[in-house]
């Protein structure tokens, strides 16, 4: 990731009076999807390439039964997502490792807890979170 651009975007967001919770929620949702993509890629069921995600229908055939009853769109179920969106989210660059994605999810949780404790320091909390997530990427 681009730490400088991320920090600048956070500054713009909070300059206009933004709140941290929607950012954290969006990051958690996207990260949940990437965790599932990474697990499927590591299992050899999908491949992230220049045209998005290849093999998603095959992976769905293998694992959709694990999500019985989960038919509404949700970041908890990769197979309810628009395949085009998943491909764009995964991008054509190398996916982060599963460990990095899990660590990021933990950082998002820590940041959410911190903004509850320090509601007037939301920008600083997200800035610190971004540094922790992107500096080690």
Predicted regions and their residues:
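C-terminal alpha-helical interaction modules of replication/initiation AAA+ assemblies
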Residues: 5-137
